[in-house]
């Protein structure tokens, strides 16, 4: 099955993310499970340009990528403004959840594909590459204001918070990710993002000297995936420091 645009971008940008998110661990390339329920909302021309921008970011050419990303973000934002009280989702479960919330609040809401937020998401990666974590956080906060349950956005926001040493914000975000991931319709996606949340929580616990909590998080990650090398490495690190 053809991978969604989100999965393609995540695969290419993982090394960029890993460079700042897990400084003690060996960089582990992970095959992000395909989101079988995601819809490709972006027009083909925008998809091609976004993939080109992503390739530039991957090759550390953020200065060259930024003009292209700025244009794509502008185009995507213009599309989002066409919709009333717009929200975004990447699967049917999250779409229904957003519509139910809107119905309960008495607000008319239009839910579009989360693909429309990918240009800003990739621009956040570019900010990370530039070590401009505050700008990356602002980009991701804007994304999450529209797509509050999408796991890739929550995961990156938590990583940025950890990089900024805002561990309270990181903890809140990763706990949101952990809960959101449980609702994903694809079991591989659900396990992958729950593991990412637990590793993010473990990292923050280590940085705050909460060794027991960190060990528990990494153990939970390994219960989900015994072959999670990043969790294995971090658990070994924690055990060495608890002796």
Please give the residue ranges for each predicted region.
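Residue-level recognition of tetratricopeptide repeat
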Residues: 45, 116, 149-150, 184, ...
